[in-house]
A protein has these predicted regions:
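Pseudouridine synthase
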Residues: 191
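Charged, glycine-rich intrinsically disordered N-terminal tails and low-complexity linkers that flank
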Residues: 1-79
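Catalytic cores of nuclease domains that cleave nucleic-acid phosphodiester backbones
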Residues: 3-6, 68-188
Length: 191
């Protein structure tokens, strides 16, 4: 029954280059892009100038530093996603098939947390699908489910989204809110 329902998503295609989704050949908006429409744009140059002044350096150095942090964070996330998908699906060499420029000590902690979760979750979560592309032509949205499980405890499906953020803030530390019509929500990692 579950797998028959998941067949609805067989025509959702994710293209890594350009990070785009299509459903039956029609381009759709990613959920991440959609959510981004309700966030205030980050004033990169303004804040780079402020930070450069505070740290007694140049805007270019700050921008390069931020870009480097972003690349490493994305690589760390990609590595965990690949590791989790391979591990859950019993693929043998999840750590050696990708070359990532990341802080290995920090990543090792993340991997360790995943393995703890995996061992604990085997008691009541049954893996259904990893990196599952989903979408709705009615909503015009597509996205990727990192891991779909069936929960014995809940008697239904549970969606997991692997996170490697340094912090997971549930509130905005600057009291920033999302834009209308979701302005009641804090702008933070949790939203």
């Amino acid at each position: 029954m579950i797998f028959q329902e998941l067949n609805k998503f067989n025509n959702v295609v994710f293209t890594e280059e350009g990070h785009t989704y299509t459903l039956n050949g029609e381009p759709l908006t990613s959920v991440t892009t959609f959510i981004g429409k309700f966030k205030k744009p980050f004033m990169r140059d303004f804040w780079a100038d402020k930070t450069a002044q505070k740290e007694n350096t140049t805007r270019e150095e700050i921008l390069n530093k931020w870009d480097s942090i972003t690349v490493r964070a994305c690589n760390k996330g990609s590595k965990l996603h690949a590791y989790a998908e391979n591990y859950i699906n019993n693929k043998i060499l999840p750590n050696t098939i990708y070359d990532f420029n990341i802080d290995n000590e920090a990543y090792t902690k993340i991997e360790s947390h995943f393995l703890e979760f995996y061992e604990e979750s085997k008691k009541n979560l049954i893996p259904i699908s990893s990196e599952l592309c989903v979408g709705s032509s009615a909503l015009g949205l597509c996205g990727m489910v990192d891991q779909l499980y069936y929960s014995d405890t809940l008697g239904g499906l549970v969606i997991f989204d692997w996170k490697t953020n340094k912090k997971m803030n549930y509130k905005s530390k600057f009291q920033n809110k999302m834009l209308e019509p979701v302005s009641h929500l804090d702008e933070c990692e949790f939203t």
